[in-house]
């Protein structure tokens, strides 16, 4: 709270996006180097918070602190990082959803969720211009909505992909992703995301699906976190240079809100008890 107030003034709660990043340690490290070590990183009006595995025991103290940090809306969103070549089975989805439901109970707030797929490349694309790549789903999305939103990505992936390949033949990420989605990838995603849609469950709002190359972060974030005490000044230990790949989620945060969990039931119970006692 003191750090954010010092950086963004007393009104930081209206300016700053708070995002919880979940998944296995290796996947999170690939997407946000140093996040596990630092536990949180801040920059560009965005705070990324380490959430760890959704199947692990949850840190109740952390979520209690988050609930107090910004009452009413403790998080703007939750990102579930998916490793390369990961098979999203119904069992994995069920485990994820149960973990997210538990976090919602601890926060008393169900935040929008983005799934973030890390993609591989057989050669380095570190100099490729980065941009946010993904699709947003409407509230209470159905399978047809997933298909439609992913299909809407294809023209831009093709146009931008051709432009990047023309500049550098090794920068083929967008072109290959578009071809993958066109050649059955969209249908597979629509089928794999069925457990996340409103027809299957109501408690976890799936907002979108993002894609990026693994380890594609800006070089400014590649700090020697293994020995942070020696290499990073105290004032910069939680500094984040937010990559352009995050801009889609950050820009989407003001357009979508989560919902409170449990509060209406608790208030109703309190009223009933007051009537009985009074």
Q: In which residue ranges do the predicted regions lie?
A:
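Basic, amphipathic N-terminal segments
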Residues: 1-278
């Amino acid at each position: 709270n003191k750090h954010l107030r010092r950086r963004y003034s007393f009104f930081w709660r209206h300016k700053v996006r708070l995002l919880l990043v979940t998944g296995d340690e290796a996947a999170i490290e690939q997407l946000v180097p140093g996040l596990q070590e630092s536990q949180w990183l801040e920059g560009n009006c965005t705070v990324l918070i380490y959430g760890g595995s959704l199947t692990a025991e949850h840190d109740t103290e952390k979520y209690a602190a988050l609930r107090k940090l910004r009452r009413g809306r403790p998080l703007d969103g939750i990102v579930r990082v998916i490793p390369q070549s990961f098979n999203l089975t119904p069992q994995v989805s069920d485990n994820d959803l149960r973990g997210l439901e538990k976090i919602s109970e601890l926060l008393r707030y169900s935040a929008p969720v983005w799934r973030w797929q890390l993609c591989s490349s057989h050669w380095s694309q570190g100099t490729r211009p980065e941009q946010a790549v993904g699709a947003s789903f409407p509230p209470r999305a159905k399978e047809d909505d997933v298909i439609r939103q992913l299909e809407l990505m294809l023209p831009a992936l093709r146009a931008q992909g051709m432009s990047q390949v023309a500049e550098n033949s090794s920068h083929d990420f967008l072109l290959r992703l578009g071809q993958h989605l066109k050649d059955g990838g969209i249908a597979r995603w629509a089928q794999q995301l069925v457990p996340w849609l409103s027809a299957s469950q109501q408690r976890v709002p799936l907002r979108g699906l993002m894609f990026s190359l693994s380890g594609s972060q800006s070089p400014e974030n590649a700090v020697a976190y293994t020995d942070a005490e020696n290499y990073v000044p105290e004032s910069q230990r939680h500094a984040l240079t937010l990559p352009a790949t995050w801009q889609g989620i950050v820009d989407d945060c003001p357009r979508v809100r989560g919902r409170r969990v449990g509060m209406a039931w608790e208030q109703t119970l309190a009223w009933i008890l007051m009537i009985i006692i009074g």
